[in-house]
Amino acid sequence: MAEITASMVKELREKTDAPMMECKKALTEAAGDLAKAEEILRVKLGSKASKAASRVTAEGIVATWQSADGKLAALVEVNCETDFVAKNDDFLAFSAAVAELVATRNPADVAAIGALDLGGQTVEQVRTALVGKIGENITIRRFTRIDAQGAVASYIHAGAKIGVLVDLVGGSEALGKDLAMHIAAAKPKALMASEIPAELIDTERRIAIEKAREAGKPEAMLDRIADGTVQKFLKEVTLLGQPFVKDDKLTIEALLKSRNASVASFVLYIVGEGIEKKVSDFAAEVAAQAAAAAQK
């Protein structure tokens, strides 16, 4: 059998970006044939990616990209399994690259991103290799692309766990940044009341009526009480109705009016929002890992 040297391992690692021990194993299996070892690694990395695909990816980051003139921007959420990997440099670089591709290439949906070119490979090939290198499932969950009416302001908060884009027409760069930070803090569901789904308003109304009834309020007053409750709810969940976080005596609508500005649209992403996280049994995980190691 050919001797597997450190320089051979280094060369294969540089070509494939695979972990060092995986490179050594592949070279051993290939009897020192570098090309064959590379093929073996491609198969193994693909296999790892397939095995990881069923695992929950509730951690991750949001990443943004925007043009210098603020006219084009994108916000993406890329998920992984643990917060540790969410801080990995390769994972961060991949997420940033995906955000730029979304903005500049305008894919139709998440599936279409996988076919885009990224450094001579498809995004899906790069993702698969990254899964093999890191050992965790990685998924591109969602994206929003804004072709701005005005100029886009962005804000990333809390270790890239919350991301905001705001298309601000008029105003200033400072106002855009303030609005983006406000959205991250206040988390509005919509820009204005007309964008809130009717079924959500109906639910709030029914709850208000039942609460008032249980409190012993007269039946003749229930509708009026419900109206007031719904109006309060709409102010709480719409950007224009919310009090400005830096001055709660001023609503966002009033703030915009005072600056002769308007918001064309905004998007808010919170990492893992709506994903049910798997509750781990640490002892069971250790036992499973020990059993798997014993079988090798």
Swiss-Prot record:
Transmembrane domains' residue ranges: none
Name of this chain's protein: Elongation factor Ts
Region Involved in Mg(2+) ion dislocation from EF-Tu, annotated ranges: 82-85
Any one Gene Ontology cellular component term annotated for this protein: cytoplasm
Compartment annotation: Cytoplasm
GO molecular function annotations of the record: translation elongation factor activity
Record family assignment: Belongs to the EF-Ts family.
InterPro entries reported for this sequence: EF-Ts_dimer_sf, Transl_elong_EFTs/EF1B, Transl_elong_EFTs/EF1B_dimer, Transl_elong_Ts_CS, UBA-like_sf
Naturally occurring in which organism (per UniProt): Aromatoleum aromaticum (strain DSM 19018 / LMG 30748 / EbN1) (Azoarcus sp. (strain EbN1))
Entry-linked NCBIfam families: tsf
Main localization of the protein described in the UniProt heading: cytoplasm
Pfam family membership, one: EF_TS
Highest taxon of source: Bacteria
Cited function: Associates with the EF-Tu.GDP complex and induces the exchange of GDP to GTP. It remains bound to the aminoacyl-tRNA.EF-Tu.GTP complex up to the GTP hydrolysis stage on the ribosome.
Keyword annotations: Cytoplasm, Elongation factor, Protein biosynthesis
